[in-house]
Amino acid sequence: MNTQEAIRNIEREKENFPLYESVRDKVVETLSYGQKRLIALMSAIVSGESCIIIDEATDGLDVNNRKILSNAIRKAAKGRIVLVVAHDLTFASQIADCLVFMKDGCLTEIQENSGEPEIEKMYEQLYSEEGGR
C-alpha cells in the first residue's frame, strides 16, 4: 500500500476510533497501554489486509476502550476475516459470529455464536472436567 492509500484508509476508518484525533500527533511512548492497543488495531484495519488476527484484544483496556474496540472490530469484519483469540467470554459473545474452542492445543469445538449463556455452558463442559484450561 502506498502513502496515499494509507491516508485514505485512515480517513475512512478514523471515525471508528474516537481517540484518533487526541493521539495522532503524540509520540507513541507517551500513550497509555490501552491507547497503544487501539492504535495497533487501527493500523491492522487500515492496512487493507483481508485477514486480521488479534490476540487477547481486551487485555489492559478500560470499559470505554473495550466498547470502542468491540465496535471497531465489528465494523472491520465486514468483507474480511477477523480471528480474535480471547479468554473473555463476554467480549467473545459480543463480537464473534463463530466460536472455536481449544483444549490442550487442539480444536475441540466449533459453534455458531448463540449468546453468552450458551458460550459459558460450552466452556464449562469443555474445561471443568480437569479443573480448568
Feature-to-residue mapping (PLM):
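ABC-family nucleotide-binding domains
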Residues: 62
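Hydrophobic anchor residue at the start of the ABC signature
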Residues: 41
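Conserved ABC ATPase signature
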Residues: 27-31
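Helical segment within the ABC ATPase nucleotide-binding domain
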Residues: 67-78
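Conserved beta-strand-loop-alpha-helix hinge in the C-terminal portion
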Residues: 106-128
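Catalytic Walker B motif of ABC-type/P-loop ATPase nucleotide-binding domains
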Residues: 52-55
